[in-house]
């Protein structure tokens, strides 16, 4: 297989997975902030947890060049579709589409149509995304586009080297995302005031939902959402498809 074809398939896998991961992070964080429990007496605890998302995506430096503060509007705008963010959902879908456009004879028509449709629907007309429930709907659409593309690829792409390069890109991006999540989650727990321990269950739930693992974890463990158990599940579980 030519190196250009292999590289493009690899990056298509990464970009599609990156768009899905970013959409999941935004959507889960949006709902987590809305539903965050009030902890009486917990001073100095920030209820809005938007800044950690920048650490997850390694975008904080670039973000600070355009915004003064990280909040529920600036971070979603940056991660979803800001034109200067090369890792945004919009940029990831656009790059995946561009790579796929040069491989029209190597991928199925259905794969191309799915990518092209996602690009047209999610990369334009984003003015109202940050209004009311627009962010949730946008993130759901991005995740569903990724799921649809992965399902069609699984059903239509021959199991030759091209398939394995596409899969390698997807899996490496997925592993990188899980490891970043666990690292930031560990940093959030360091030095946490005892009165704020009530937030631990809430944060654990958000972490698991960010990688679509909450239900799978609950079926395996009928106990409190302890950080150690969550980390072990996401790192070592042999049956969960998103574990490292």
What are these regions (language model features)?
Residues 1-244:
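Alpha-helical transmembrane segments and their helix-helix packing motifs
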């Amino acid at each position: 297989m030519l190196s250009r074809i292999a590289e493009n398939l690899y990056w298509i896998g990464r970009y599609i997975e990156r768009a899905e991961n970013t959409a999941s992070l935004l959507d889960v964080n949006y709902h987590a902030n809305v539903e965050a429990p009030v902890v009486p007496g917990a001073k100095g605890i920030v209820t809005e947890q938007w800044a950690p998302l920048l650490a997850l995506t390694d975008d904080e430096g670039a973000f600070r060049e355009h915004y003064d503060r990280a909040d529920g509007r600036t971070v979603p705008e940056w991660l979803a579709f800001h034109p200067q963010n090369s890792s945004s959902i919009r940029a990831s879908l656009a790059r995946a589409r561009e790579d796929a456009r040069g491989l029209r004879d190597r991928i199925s028509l259905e794969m191309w149509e799915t990518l092209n449709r996602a690009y047209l629907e999610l990369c334009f007309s984003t003015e109202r995304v940050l209004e009311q429930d627009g962010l949730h709907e946008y993130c759901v659409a991005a995740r569903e586009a990724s799921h649809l593309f992965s399902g069609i690829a699984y059903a239509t792409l021959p199991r030759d080297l091209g398939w394995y390069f596409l899969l390698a890109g997807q899996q490496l991006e997925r592993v990188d995302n899980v490891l970043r999540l666990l690292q930031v989650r560990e940093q959030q727990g360091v030095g946490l005031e005892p009165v704020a321990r009530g937030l631990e269950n809430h944060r654990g739930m958000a972490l698991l939902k960010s990688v679509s693992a909450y239900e799978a974890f609950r079926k395996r463990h009928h106990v409190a959402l302890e950080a150690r158990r969550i980390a072990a599940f996401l790192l070592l579980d042999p049956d969960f498809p998103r574990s490292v």
